[in-house]
Amino acid sequence: MKLTRRNMLITSSASAVAVAMGAFPAFASMTDDEIAKLTGGAELGEGAITIDAPEIAENGNTVPIGVTAPGAVAVTLFADGNPLPAVATFKFGPLSASRTASTRIRLAKTQNVVAIAEMEDGTFQKASANVKVTIGGCGG
């Protein structure tokens, strides 16, 4: 390959992009790390909680999400495609009649929304839903 100014610019630009991309971990692995930190590495059960999310969200700026978690003391929501995956935490007191929570979250792109519930007996339960976003809400 002949060393020209054009080849030098292309090579250096490609190298800079490759180095920059290596500095950022994948968002899904960030979510897994956050969940492991929350649960202390405990095994996650499924089926005891439900997450209510739209299959398709036309605008990622306001996506309605609901969680029903009977017997939970806390529920944390994660969006694995967002730059900061931890979205919200809801805590329930001993006198809470209904262990449900709802909010609107911002999603950058099509991704999984994961709810992790800490139950009264100290175990953890998981529920997830895939939300297809047509217009991203985090600068997308």
Residue ranges and their predicted role:
Residues 69-73:
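Short proline/glycine-enriched turn/loop motifs at strand-loop junctions of beta-rich domains
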Residues 76-78:
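Beta-strand signatures of extracellular beta-sandwich domains
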Residues 130-134:
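Short beta-strand edge segments in extracellular beta-sheet folds
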